[in-house]
């Protein structure tokens, strides 16, 4: 029995179309239009959401601006209390939200539930961390700088930016919405959420949990619609004071149009896995399979290219192939390891990379197999730098192996990429691992583990085309605030008294 849009969530559904949320109410768009969300498994329309107009975006922004002023004056402990309540409601209603993730983005059922629970934990932790971070200020006295007496005291604290525009990606529409919503709200900001089309209904259910928690009217909005209609309008809106975006190269275009608005962006990666001769090959093979093929490789932090020393390449490829043969391929409802990729266009793009590699002589460790959006796991050996898949991000269950003859060769390939999100190194020599880590031009390097985002309080950032700024709970709270200073001027130096 379907759980989405029923029970406490019934009010977010208008017939067959999910409403959008603005000014504390669930609304039907005046456009009279809707956007279809196609189930990646059935390739049929699963849900519909409102196609909001630019005027409706304007009204949401106006309401956010008004609500934010009052919210910023709300005591910090009260903000935290409402966030804790929202987190509890979110976890209580994990089943219908997880159902949406299964049907919208083909996320395996067990992983869908885990994402919702993780999102609730993230929001609670954010509330706790926010009380600590924002509850502290800084005092600086003037005589610490040469030539000054102690006649000035500078008190600095963090204040909200205003209205945060949050744009999460399809692959983690709940968790990466929570990672933006929580920090924005605890810091005293208002928030306008523009969810991805695939994942929009899960996001709407999530927003309703915040509605049920009792956040002030207008503080949170969730607008849905076509990017061609409201995408640029949102990102260039004069009412936006901060943009937090996770996704692909659309973010580069946003950054060029954003002007003076602070940006937090994670835009993908080509995460390299460098394997040295002394590595634990069982550990390596397990992490290559987990890192490269979890959620069908549709993760920014997935292993995207394996750079392995020639002397151990055959052994590692053999171990990886044995593990790939055991993966369950099928629909997400069956908790399959490999599920359909999110859209037909994504599957076509992946196939294009595979065919290019085939034409240029890559070794296919498995037969290439595709049914609709479902692509079976494929390891490509003897990949060369002239193949597209050596550089482009497939975002699917296809992984290239490049054989190298030196550590320097592996580092060079990693650093030649226009991406720089994460990378990983497998070796028993910690000294060598640190040296390689320092040489890799990535935001994070994992030693003896596959790339990963999290735990959610860890710093998470990319270099080059992989992003701007840093995420993680503490970093996000700091990014969504600005420093306000008050200087107390004394008529005479304070240490003359007493």
Curated annotation (Swiss-Prot):
Its EC number is 1.2.1.9. It catalyses: D-glyceraldehyde 3-phosphate + NADP(+) + H2O = (2R)-3-phosphoglycerate + NADPH + 2 H(+). The record marks 171 as: Transition state stabilizer. Keywords: Cytoplasm, NADP, Oxidoreductase. NAD(+) binds at residues 247-251. The active site is at residues 266, 300. Disulfide bonds: none annotated. Substrate binds at residues 118, 171-172, 299-301, 453. It is found in: Cytoplasm. Pfam families: Aldedh. It comes from the Eukaryota. GO terms for molecular function: glyceraldehyde-3-phosphate dehydrogenase (NADP+) (non-phosphorylating) activity; lactaldehyde dehydrogenase (NAD+) activity. One of its GO terms (cellular component) is cytoplasm. InterPro entries: Ald_DH/histidinol_DH, Ald_DH_C, Ald_DH_CS_CYS, Ald_DH_CS_GLU, Ald_DH_N, Aldehyde_DH_dom, ALDH-related_metabolic_enz. SUPFAM superfamilies: ALDH-like. NADP(+) binds at residues 194, 197, 232, 393. Belongs to the aldehyde dehydrogenase family. Important as a means of generating NADPH for biosynthetic reactions. This is NADP-dependent glyceraldehyde-3-phosphate dehydrogenase. It comes from Zea mays. The gene is GPN1.
């Amino acid at each position: 029995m379907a759980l989405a849009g029923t029970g406490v969530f019934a009010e977010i559904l208008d017939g067959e179309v999910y409403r959008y949320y603005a000014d504390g109410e669930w609304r039907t768009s005046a456009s009279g239009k809707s956007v279809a969300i196609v189930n990646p498994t059935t390739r049929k329309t699963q849900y519909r959401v409102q196609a909001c107009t630019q005027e409706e975006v304007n009204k949401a922004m106006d309401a956010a601006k008004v609500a934010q002023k009052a919210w910023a004056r709300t005591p910090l402990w009260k903000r935290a209390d409402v966030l804790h309540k929202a987190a509890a409601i979110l976890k209580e209603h994990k089943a219908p939200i997880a159902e949406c993730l299964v049907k919208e983005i083909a996320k395996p059922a067990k992983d869908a539930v885990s994402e919702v629970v993780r999102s609730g934990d993230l929001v609670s932790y954010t509330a706790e961390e926010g009380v600590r971070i924002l509850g502290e200020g800084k005092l600086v006295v003037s005589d610490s700088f040469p030539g000054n007496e102690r006649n000035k005291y500078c008190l600095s604290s963090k204040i909200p930016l205003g209205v945060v525009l949050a744009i999460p990606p399809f692959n983690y529409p709940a968790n990466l919405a929570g990672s933006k919503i929580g920090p924005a709200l605890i810091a005293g900001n208002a928030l306008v959420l523009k969810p991805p089309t695939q994942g929009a209904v899960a996001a709407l259910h999530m927003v309703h949990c915040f509605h049920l928690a009792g956040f002030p009217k207008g503080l949170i909005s969730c607008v849905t619609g076509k990017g061609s209609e409201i995408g640029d309008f949102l990102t260039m809106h004069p009412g936006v004071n901060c943009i937090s975006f996770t996704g692909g190269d659309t973010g580069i275009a946003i950054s060029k149009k954003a002007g003076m608005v602070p940006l937090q962006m994670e835009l993908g990666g080509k995460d390299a896995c460098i394997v040295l001769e002394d590595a634990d090959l069982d550990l390596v093979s397990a992490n290559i399979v987990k890192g490269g093929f979890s959620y069908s490789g549709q993760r920014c932090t997935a292993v995207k290219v394996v750079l392995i020393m020639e002397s151990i390449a055959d052994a590692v490829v053999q171990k990886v192939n044995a593990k790939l043969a055991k993966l369950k391929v099928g629909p997400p409802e069956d908790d399959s390891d490999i599920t359909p990729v999110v859209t037909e266009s994504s599957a076509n793009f992946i196939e294009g990379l595979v065919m290019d590699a085939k034409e240029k002589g890559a070794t296919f460790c498995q037969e290439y197999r595709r049914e609709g959006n479902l692509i079976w796991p494929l390891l490509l050996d003897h990949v060369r730098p002239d193949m597209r898949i050596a550089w482009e991000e497939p975002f699917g269950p296809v992984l290239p192996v490049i054989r190298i003859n030196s550590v320097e060769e592996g580092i060079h390939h990693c650093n030649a990429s226009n991406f720089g999100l994460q990378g990983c190194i497998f070796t028993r020599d910690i000294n060598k691992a640190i040296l390689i880590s320092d040489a890799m031009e990535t935001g994070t390097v994992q030693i003896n583990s596959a790339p990963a985002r999290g735990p959610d309080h860890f710093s998470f950032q990319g270099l080059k085309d992989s992003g701007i700024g840093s995420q993680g709970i503490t970093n996000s709270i700091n990014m969504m605030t600005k420093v306000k200073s008050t200087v107390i001027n004394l008529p005479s130096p304070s240490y003359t008294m007493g």
